[in-house]
């Protein structure tokens, strides 16, 4: 599956972030904002990527492995990271462009993040609910 940078500068999309390409990271940070300083808490609890837009779902379906994911809080939003085989993919989001929905599913709780170009469903253990809610509030504002 090709994930070439075909969208306009600053457009939300799925990025292959495996390699240290400064131009690619500049575009990712143009969307989500720069990383927070090292002394600020910026990582989410561990999440499982369950579903996503067609682009994300095609990658998730490539292997039967559990797709662990995490969110990194940035100055203006967050970046979702997940791995497929040896590649690391990311979806940057800008605060204000995201709609958040919470739900329950069997033994897990789920978080759905909706944006214009990318939608994902993430699962986490119910015991992590407060930590995930705090992260989402810090990254995307009150929901």
Language model segments and positions:
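Acidic, Ser/Thr- and proline-rich intrinsically disordered linker/docking segments
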Residues: 2-63, 97-143
């Amino acid at each position: 599956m090709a994930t070439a940078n075909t969208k306009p500068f600053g457009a939300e999309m799925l990025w292959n972030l495996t390699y240290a390409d400064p131009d690619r990271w500049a575009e990712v940070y143009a969307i989500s904002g720069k990383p927070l300083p090292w002394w600020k808490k910026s990582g989410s609890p561990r999440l499982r990527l369950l579903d996503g837009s067609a682009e994300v779902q095609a990658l998730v379906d490539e292997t039967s492995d559990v797709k662990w994911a995490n969110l990194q809080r940035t100055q203006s939003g967050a970046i979702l990271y997940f791995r497929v085989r040896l590649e690391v993919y990311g979806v940057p989001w800008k605060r204000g462009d995201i709609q958040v929905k919470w739900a329950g599913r069997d033994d897990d709780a789920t978080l759905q993040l909706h944006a214009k170009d990318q939608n994902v469903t993430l699962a986490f253990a119910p015991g992590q609910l407060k930590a995930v809610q705090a992260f989402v509030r810090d990254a995307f504002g009150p929901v």
